[in-house]
Every structure is written in C-alpha cells, then in structure tokens.
Amino acid sequence: MVSYKLIYFQSRGNGEIARQVFAFAGQEFIDERISKEQWAEIKNMTPFGQVPVLEVDGRQLAQSITIVRYLSKQFGISGKSSWEEAQVDALGDQFKDYRVEARPFFRAKMGFSDGDVDQLYKDLFVPAFNKMYSIFTESLKSSGSGFLVGDSLTWMDLAIAQHSADLLEADGKILDTFLEMKDHQKKIHSIPNVKKWIEKRPVTSR
C-alpha cells in the first residue's frame, strides 16, 4: 500500500488543494504541518528548499501544482482524456498568471510588503480578478455540467472553489457579478468528502 505524507506550514496556502485531492479521493495521508522553527531545521533536506513537499513511500516531490497534478492523475481527477487534461492545465496556468498579477495587492493586504492597499486593489486586483473570473465563467458555461472541464470534478474545480471561498470570507459580495462562480463554489464544497474535510480541517486564517 502506498504511503503518502504532505509537508507544509500550519495554514491552507499552497498545500490546501493537495489535501483536498486526498480528501475527495478518500485517501489516507499524513498531514504534517510544520512551524517556522521546524522549517528552518528541514529546509535543506527538501528538493528545492521550499514547501509543500509530497513524500510517496519516502520519495520526495516538490512544487505545489506539480504535486496536485501528480495526485490528480493517481486518483482520476485530472481530466478524462488527454484533451481534457490539457484544458485543465491551461486553466491552472491562467490561475497562476492571475496570482502573479494580483500578488502585490495580496502581499500588501497581508502586511508582507509596503503599498497603498486601496490603490493596488483598484489597479491590480480588480482587473486581474475580472479577467480570470470571466474566463472561468465561460468554461463553466461551455461544459454545461457545473464543472469547469468535462462532466466531472477535476483538481481545478477544487483550486478555484477554495480561492472563491477565501475571497468570499473577506468580502461576501465579491462574486455577486459572477453568480455562476458563486454557485460553483457551493457545489464543489458540498461534495460529501470535500465538505467533510473542510469541516474537520484545522482553522487557519489562510
């Protein structure tokens, strides 16, 4: 039997979607949440000096999206065909682009960097948010299934649903102009195994 361990900080962050893939699949795994002090001790023992790190029977795999894509293929939620997999990956890359574009706003908002939060919100976040959520809305309409690609859940459904939930936590009206995406978040987080995970996971700010 394969043994899985996911090593990440005591937060959702870049480790959460991998955790939700495990949860959806009903796959047991060790959810090792480390402190900053523990991170300093193990950093040099990780592949790229960063987390998350996935251990599969002791072998290490790094990079959050690579981990999620690997697990999704193992558990059948990467897309039902090579074409669907490519569509899912394209949305994943678009999501990454959005996060890069909006990063200065999020960092300033969380106090990690200086900057006028209100101005960054208007200049960076809003355009990036509107662009991405428009793209994802069109994907939902195109699939006609309630999922982003094809007729079943993929890892990108988990990723965008969690991001939508995080945004709604900060601003309950933010998806009022993207109601399809609001419904999508509710749908994904109502899936029994996902819902169960969200209810039992440690409470963290992000």
Swiss-Prot record:
Recorded superkingdom: Eukaryota
Gene: gst-9
Reaction equations catalysed: RX + glutathione = an S-substituted glutathione + a halide anion + H(+)
SUPFAM superfamilies in the cross-refs: GST C-terminal domain-like, Thioredoxin-like
Chain positions recorded as glutathione binding sites: 8, 39, 43, 49-51, 63-64
InterPro entries per the UniProt record, alphabetical: Glutathione-S-Trfase_C-like, Glutathione-S-Trfase_C_sf, Glutathione_S-Trfase_N, GST_C, GST_superfamily, Thioredoxin-like_sf
Residue ranges annotated for the GST C-terminal domain, each copy included: 81-206
GO molecular function per UniProt: glutathione transferase activity
Protein name: Probable glutathione S-transferase 9
Coiled coil: none
Domain GST N-terminal residue range list: 2-79
